[in-house]
Amino acid sequence: MSLEDDVKAIIVDQLGVSPEDVKVDSSFIEDLNADSLDLTELIMTLEEKFAFEISEDDAEQLRTVGDVIKYIQEHQN
């Protein structure tokens, strides 16, 4: 499974959305109807899965699925 597929699977599971709705340019708030609690839980799950911490400032900048994928690519060991 690719990084993109892993991230999308986590988003589908955490937000309870359809896999077809999760695209690289999908906005968590506008397209996937996530609220701040959803986003906090999503960040915690991503941190656990990919074994690194996402700072609060960085988390606020992660607005789309693509933002998350790019962030993980840049911060993985």
UniProtKB/Swiss-Prot annotation:
UniProt keywords, alphabetically: Cytoplasm, Fatty acid biosynthesis, Fatty acid metabolism, Lipid biosynthesis, Lipid metabolism, Phosphopantetheine, Phosphoprotein
Keyword field contains Isomerase: no
Domain Carrier: 1-76
Modified residues (O-(pantetheine 4'-phosphoryl)serine): S36
Domain of life: Bacteria
Subcellular location field: Cytoplasm
Pathway membership, UniProt: Lipid metabolism; fatty acid biosynthesis
GO CC field: cytosol; membrane
A Pfam cross-reference name: PP-binding
Any one biological process term the GO annotation gives: lipid A biosynthetic process
The record's account of how the chain is modified after translation: 4'-phosphopantetheine is transferred from CoA to a specific serine of apo-ACP by AcpS. This modification is essential for activity because fatty acids are bound in thioester linkage to the sulfhydryl of the prosthetic group.
Disulfide bonds: none
SUPFAM superfamilies in the record: ACP-like
Gene Ontology molecular function terms on file: acyl binding; acyl carrier activity
Entries under InterPro entries matching the protein: ACP, ACP-like_sf, PP-bd_ACP, Ppantetheine_attach_site
Function: Carrier of the growing fatty acid chain in fatty acid biosynthesis.
Family according to the record: Belongs to the acyl carrier protein (ACP) family.
Protein name: Acyl carrier protein
UniProt gene name: acpP
